[in-house]
A protein has these predicted regions:
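Short arginine-rich
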Residues: 67-70, 78-79
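N-terminal soluble domains immediately following signal/targeting peptides that reside
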Residues: 63-65
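Short S/T/G/P-rich N-terminal loop/turn motif that feeds into the first structured element of a domain
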Residues: 1-44, 51-58, 77-131
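Short, flexible helix/strand-to-coil boundary loops that buttress conserved ligand/catalytic motifs
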Residues: 60, 69-72
């Protein structure tokens, strides 16, 4: 994912977001990295690698991940979520879309928060950002 925080968000809050994202990426069950987006159009980026789609779905619905979304999304202006798979079976792509859709269906408050973003792109983009 890549994102940019709203310019009016105080530096102390940005620092807390960075600390939380860094801690989350270091304690998850995936190989992950969080940091500044170098050379891109965003401030921050994170990449995670999972051995299975089940692990990925569990992370997406983990209470700590959901709490970070609920705290962070109101502070973000632009967000891009992307999924990369090394399996070229179209069914895998469909399953990833379904993982996101199940998450949005189970947590409609996230859709409301995503609707407040100026820009959102990603798998199964919900609400006003749906394509």
């Amino acid at each position: 994912m890549r994102f940019t925080i709203r310019p009016e968000v105080p530096k102390e809050t940005v620092d807390a977001i960075v600390a939380g994202m860094s801690a989350q990426s270091s304690t998850s069950d995936s190989d992950g990295l969080f940091g500044r987006d170098v050379g891109g159009e965003f401030q921050f980026a994170a990449v995670s690698r999972f051995e299975s789609l089940e692990q990925y779905e569990a992370m997406m619905n983990d209470p700590e991940h959901l709490e970070m979304d609920r705290m962070g999304l109101p502070l973000i202006s632009r967000f891009v979520s992307f999924d990369i798979v090394d399996d070229f079976d179209p069914a895998v792509v469909d399953e990833i879309h379904q993982i996101h859709q199940r998450r949005f269906d189970a947590h409609p408050d996230l859709v409301e928060l995503i609707d407040t973003l100026d820009e959102y792109q990603g798998s199964a983009a919900p609400g006003k950002h749906a394509r």
